[in-house]
Amino acid sequence: MIVQWYPGHMQKAKREILELNKYIDLYLILLDARAPLSSRNEQLEVLIKDKPKIYVLNKSDLADETKNHEFAKYFQKNNQVAVCIDSLKGTNVKSILKIAENLLKDKIEEAKQRGRRKIIRFAVLGIPNVGKSTLINKITNSAKARTGDKPGVTRAKQWIKINDYFEMLDTPGILIPKLEDDTVAIKLCAIGSVKEELFDKEFVAKKTIGMIKEEYSHLLKARYSIDFSTLSEEEYLIEIGKKRGCILKEGKIDTLKAATMFLDDLRKGKIGRITLDEVVRR
């Protein structure tokens, strides 16, 4: 399965980033903590390679806590600044400004020496539905940026004043134009970063079950009370349908409904704290 999705507004945003880069002091690269590597857009990062960046692993409350620490160390080992946050609850959000100020302390000090006040300008970048607008709302304590739980809700860019020293630019999320790696595509579909009409939910649900059935078997068993050990992914999905009453009129199991239910449970953390990516060992 290959998801091909790159709407016109996404292409426009990419061009605008190139134009805006000369005005931006620092970028917040928002990643989904459940898939920190899969939710990176390294094609985008090439465009802004000359600017400081903070990798913000959002939705860390839904991700495996142990792996949150592992990924934070992974970025640090690669000389990249990373912080795990929960933008909804505000966990660690305040630390972002402190980190930004530290990264740009030389520019700030230089401005002070000249008798000026340095305005630090951010751009928030990330794939759809990673929580860009929610983060901005939490930082600014307002709802100036539209928020939603569907990928691509935020469209128009806007400058938002945080305080006398910080301004943030919210830009539309950008997804890799062609997801050639099926595993990456499945993970992004599973966490809700791709519109559901663009992929086969049953296919994604079964593949995702296959990804997590060993490491998180205890969570699956606790949620659905099903012993996975003797079942295939398809059989497991059918059993979920039976348990949850996903029955069609003719008595068959509605596997599409079961798949939808499973993916919803995964995204909302009802199964438990799960991370789909693995730290790359170097």
Regions found by a protein language model. Give the residues of each.
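Alpha-helical scaffold segments in soluble metabolic enzymes
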Residues: 95, 99, 134, 207, ...
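Short phosphate-engaging motifs
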Residues: 92, 131, 167
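Glycine-rich phosphate-binding P-loop
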Residues: 121-141, 145, 171
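Short, structured loop/turn "capping" segments at alpha-beta junctions
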Residues: 107-111, 137, 143-149, 216-220
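Solvent-exposed alpha-helices and their adjacent loops that cap or buttress functional pockets
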Residues: 115-117, 139, 160-161
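Canonical P-loop GTPase G-domain recognition
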Residues: 61-125, 144, 246
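Structural beta-sheet core signal
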Residues: 29, 55-57, 124
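Helix-rich effector regions associated with P-loop NTPase G domains
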Residues: 1-27, 34-43, 47-53, 60, ...
